[in-house]
């Protein structure tokens, strides 16, 4: 068999054009064992065209017998140091094929042109001077392998590319091997190429890694995949328990904030109630016929009533906002029979938004539950959103963990205290208004209460100066406010609510008795002066309404 360097007789130019190449063979050069071109005389066609005539050595498809596995840091525990020895022949014949795969000019050409890209025998027959065939100028488009690897690594590391003479590794083959061996773990990460243990054979890839290392790698990848899927949301029971945890933390934070706001509101209400004696004395003085009408201005006794009315309405607004936030978690997910959650099944449990109060329920939210730390959860309040029966999720989840988000007993007492102070404020205000109506005429009423509810207008009509209209507006608005507060608290809820969806925050077995003893109204026909405060306030409001209708 002829040598590898001469078994392909046609030059690359003639072979690419599928033409017959006619030339005389010449002696091979002994000083260039790694040359990619056989040293022959130029063929007739290349000589006439005045181009370089060369023949590329075909790539061998056989692995050399001296091939040994190169050690990689990923498999350092499985490959011994004794297996790292590479002979000089292996470095010369398979060096470029063991390097990471990079898109470039065929490596055999670039590597074997490093010594002498234009031998004398190739250009001696051409009318081209040797100076014009400077390798650095003519082959500037052919990248050097060392510069190529370094430039790619430098671009990935945001550093400047070094010239070929500043690559940093020794010129000795064994020294260069040790240099790359110490930095082998940087090549796959920086250049994003396959492992050096993969040998490229044409279009096929042979994995030379040990079987044990391959199995351990597959197990590690499988475990990472399992961990990733286990942490992904929406994966069965884990995601459902995560939903409970996130909902429980959110509701607990909201409950703590509402408890703090209730305490602050309670202190403000107590302070405002103490100021009722001042405006009562002022209104008593204003009801005196000897009191001059000219004194009814900013310094008149009615100004204290106006200030008290504005403060009371602002406190009612704050109290309603807090109650609304406490009731907002009672959005129930009415799931289908297979426990699937649907947006079309959302139903709000508050009185003003509920559209199906008469629908039957399979559970009672009015029944309260006590958590491990002794806190009470209000029926229909924060607890109902976290019941496994209420939320359309898997019934296998444990609803006991939801007790941590329930309000404590001090929060319920703050709610009762705020409601008590609001009733006292309304009682004091409407009692004074009723006394003025019974003692004064409509004209005197306009003089005494000329701006009870300031900055109120209906379209283009302003209520300033119309005392009777302002009182009617205040009556209707106050009545609606009290009804809304009582609805949220559960004051007027039935004693035996089989479903409990509209029971309110305080309508449960622990607080029901206290609520009834303090504020539960009786029928108005049986109420006298010694009736409860809530019933007395509403009775006073109805009396004022009858007087205003008769004027």
Curated annotation (Swiss-Prot):
Protein name in UniProt: C6 finger transcription factor imqK
Annotated gene: imqK
DNA-binding region: 11-53
Gene Ontology cellular component terms for the protein in this record: nucleus
GO aspect biological process, one term: positive regulation of metabolic process
Keywords: DNA-binding, Metal-binding, Nucleus, Transcription, Transcription regulation, Zinc
Biased composition (Low complexity): 351-369
Subcellular location: Nucleus
Induction: Expression is down-regulated by ralstonins, lipopeptides produced by the plant pathogenic bacteria Ralstonia solanacearum.
Function noted in UniProt: C6 finger transcription factor that positively regulates the cluster that mediates the biosynthesis of imizoquins A to D, tripeptide-derived alkaloids that serve a protective role against oxidative stress that are essential for normal germination.
Region (Disordered): 280-302, 351-378
Phenotype seen when the gene is deleted: Impairs the production of imizoquins and leads to delayed germination.
Major subcellular location class: nucleus
GO molecular function: DNA binding; DNA-binding transcription factor activity, RNA polymerase II-specific; zinc ion binding
């Amino acid at each position: 068999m002829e040598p590898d360097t001469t078994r392909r007789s046609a030059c690359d130019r003639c072979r690419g054009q599928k033409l017959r190449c006619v030339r005389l063979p010449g002696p091979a050069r002994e000083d260039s064992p790694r040359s990619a071109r056989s040293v022959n005389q130029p063929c007739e066609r290349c000589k006439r065209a005045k181009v370089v005539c060369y023949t590329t050595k075909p790539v061998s498809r056989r692995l050399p017998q001296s091939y040994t596995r190169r050690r990689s840091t990923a498999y350092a525990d499985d490959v011994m140091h004794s297996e790292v020895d590479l002979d000089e022949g292996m470095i010369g014949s398979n060096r470029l094929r063991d390097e990471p795969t990079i898109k470039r000019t065929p490596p055999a050409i670039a590597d074997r042109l490093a010594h002498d890209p234009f031998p004398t025998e190739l250009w001696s027959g051409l009318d081209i001077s040797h100076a014009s065939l400077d390798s650095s100028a003519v082959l500037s488009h052919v990248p050097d392998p060392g510069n190529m690897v370094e430039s790619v690594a430098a671009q990935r590391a945001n550093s400047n590319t070094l010239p070929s003479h500043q690559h940093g590794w020794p010129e000795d083959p064994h020294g260069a091997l040790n240099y790359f061996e110490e930095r082998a773990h940087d090549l796959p990460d920086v250049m994003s190429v396959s492992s050096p243990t993969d040998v490229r054979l044409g279009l096929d890839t042979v994995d030379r890694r040990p079987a044990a290392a391959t199995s351990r790698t597959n197990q590690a990848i499988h475990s990472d995949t399992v961990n990733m899927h286990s942490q992904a949301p929406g994966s069965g029971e884990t995601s459902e328990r995560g939903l409970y945890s996130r909902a429980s933390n959110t509701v607990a934070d909201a409950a703590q904030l509402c408890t703090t706001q209730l305490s602050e509101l309670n202190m403000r209400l107590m302070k405002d109630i103490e100021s009722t004696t001042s405006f009562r004395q002022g209104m008593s003085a204003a009801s005196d016929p000897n009191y001059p009408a000219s004194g009814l201005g900013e310094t008149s006794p009615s100004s204290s009533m106006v200030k008290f009315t504005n403060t009371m309405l602002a406190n009612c607004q704050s109290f309603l906002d807090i109650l609304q936030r406490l009731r907002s978690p009672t959005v129930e997910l009415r799931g289908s029979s297979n426990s699937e959650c649907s947006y079309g099944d959302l139903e709000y449990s508050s009185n003003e938004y509920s559209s199906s109060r008469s629908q039957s329920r399979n559970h009672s939210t009015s029944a309260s539950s006590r958590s491990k730390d002794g806190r009470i959860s209000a029926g229909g309040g924060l607890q109902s959103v976290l019941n496994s029966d209420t939320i359309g999720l898997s019934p296998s989840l444990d609803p006991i963990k939801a007790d941590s988000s329930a309000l404590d007993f001090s929060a319920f007492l703050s709610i009762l205290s705020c409601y008590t102070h609001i009733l006292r404020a309304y009682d004091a205000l409407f009692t004074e208004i009723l006394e003025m109506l019974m003692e004064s005429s409509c004209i005197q009423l306009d003089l005494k209460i000329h701006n009870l509810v300031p900055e109120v207008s209906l379209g283009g009509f302003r209520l300033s100066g119309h005392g009777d209209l302002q009182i009617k507006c205040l009556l209707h608005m106050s009545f609606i406010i009290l009804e809304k507060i009582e609805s949220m608290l559960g004051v007027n809820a039935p004693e035996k609510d089989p479903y409990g969806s509209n029971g309110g925050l305080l309508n449960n077995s622990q607080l029901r008795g206290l609520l009834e003893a303090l504020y539960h109204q009786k029928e108005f026909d049986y109420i006298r002066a010694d009736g409860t405060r809530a019933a007395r306030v509403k009775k006073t409001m109805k009396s004022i309404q009858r007087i205003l209708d008769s004027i």
